[in-house]
Amino acid sequence: MLKEINEQPSKIKGLLEGQLTDSGVQEEIFGPSAPDIFKKVEAVQIVACGTSFHAGTVAKYWLEGLAGLPCSVEVASEFRYRNKVVAPNTLFITISQSGETADTLACLSAAKDSGYLARLGICNVPSSSLARESDLVFLTKAGPEIGVASTKAFTTQLVGLLMLTLILGRHHGLSSAAENTINNSLRALPDSLDSVMLLEDQIIEMAEDFDQKEHALFLGRGIHYPVAMEGALKLKEISYIHAEAYPAGELKHGPLALVDSEMPVVAVAPNDDLLAKLQSNLEEVRARGGKLYVFGHSAAHQELSLIHISE
């Protein structure tokens, strides 16, 4: 798993090559019929499981915030068993690392005759059932993922979903300036991830604080909430430590009652505005003897155990 974590910069660099050109993201990377389909999209439905569901939830913020498209994200094991109302010209998206997740494939099959505009599959395995059965396909090119917990597949899924957002945004009023800014951020992403890999010693030190803990809370606001969800899932999967994720503003609505010196609180807040909003949470956690760990950009808040990540 550690090997696959460290492969993320190179895998994302390889994914972007040839797909993000000087003129932007090429629509044809999703399939030859993609340009005709994408210009008709009026809504998006995303269905996935586990880590892929978290990637889809991040994409919801992008699709609604950048492309102005209503987007719903659901767990496949729930979505497949309920009655659905399909809005006109809805793009149906499934996400799966293996392309063989049973519940996700069942939803993909049912969507064929449910009135969706088209079915887009995002996966890592070209020969998978999901890739074969979808109308459009985006391959994440992360390479074989042997680790039990998804790492490089998750981040390459996010890159693919952001590129999709940029394409759909072109058809729904996203400015060229905004698109160029995001394109430049994508180009810089491999180097930014390289800098994150240099935090290994600090992360090991943090992990030692968790060694004897039995519970943990993960917090995030907005688009960072699903990232917190992914962090909690990883701690459960790999460390067998119970962890839950909450929107940061919800800490006082129940979870705070569980915080004590034996429950660390991890916050995902990679910008100064969100970090400032955590000050009241810090005081509440401290009052109960807990410790707050923050993944952020600012070193201004010395009271926090800050894991500094590049912007």
Predicted regions and their residues:
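Active-site phosphate/pyrophosphate-binding segments
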Residues: 7-45, 126, 134-264
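Short alpha-helical basic/polar micro-motif
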Residues: 3, 233, 283
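Flexible, low-complexity linker and terminal segments
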Residues: 1-7
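A short, hydrophobic C-terminal helix/tail in secreted or cell-surface proteins
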Residues: 309-311
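Glycine-rich phosphate-binding loops that contact phosphosugars or nucleotide phosphates
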Residues: 36-174, 179-188, 268-307
